Amino acid sequence: VSRGLGDVYKRQDKELIFTETSIGMWNDGRNLEKRLMEDMEETALGTVNNWCKAVIVWNLMLDNERGPNREGGCQTCYGAVDIDRSDYKTITRNSHYYIIGHLSSVVKPGAVRIGSKGYTADGIMYSAFENLDGTEALVLLNNTDGTKNITVNSGERSFTYEVPAKAVASFR
């Protein structure tokens, strides 16, 4: 997904927004561990680290029969959240729910990406942001099989955190 975005970014007169990404039967959409790692790496962090200003996830909510949909539309998609048609109360949270949740919990409207390089030697991928109120946000992914200790430095403040294997963490 994120490959080639740097070339498009060279057109400074164009705003990059990554649109219409989905999960479904074709990409093991119910496998939360696999999808969360891949979607956070490619769809969320991979796009914003390559100059995209936003990511639009399709579909936000579907039912457990992958609907409603229109003729010719995706018949095999899952939503960020799927709701059980038998009671309209039971929900299944899928990977896109969690990528939206991690980013929106710390990155606020109008925020700008700041000083982040993406992958590190320790197998951590991250994006850092500055919100309009001056707070800073960090979303990171440990896509390795081991726990990683990280230290985050921001001016005069710093903290250390132990990131579990195959985990996403958000800080503000």
Residue ranges: model-predicted function:
Residues 14-16, 100, 148:
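C-terminal structured subdomain/cap of oxidoreductase catalytic cores
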Residues 162-172:
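C-terminal beta-strand-rich structural cap/linker in extracellular carbohydrate-active enzymes
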Residues 18-99, 115-116:
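Aromatic/acidic polysaccharide-binding cleft in carbohydrate-active enzymes
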Residues 105, 116-155, 166:
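Carbohydrate-binding surface patches
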Residues 12-15, 50-55, 109, 134:
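Loop/turn elements at helix/coil->beta-strand transitions in domains of secreted/extracellular proteins
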Residues 10-11, 21:
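Long, internal scaffold/assembly segments composed of regular secondary structure
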Residues 1-9:
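Single conserved hydrophobic/aromatic residue that forms the stacking wall/gate
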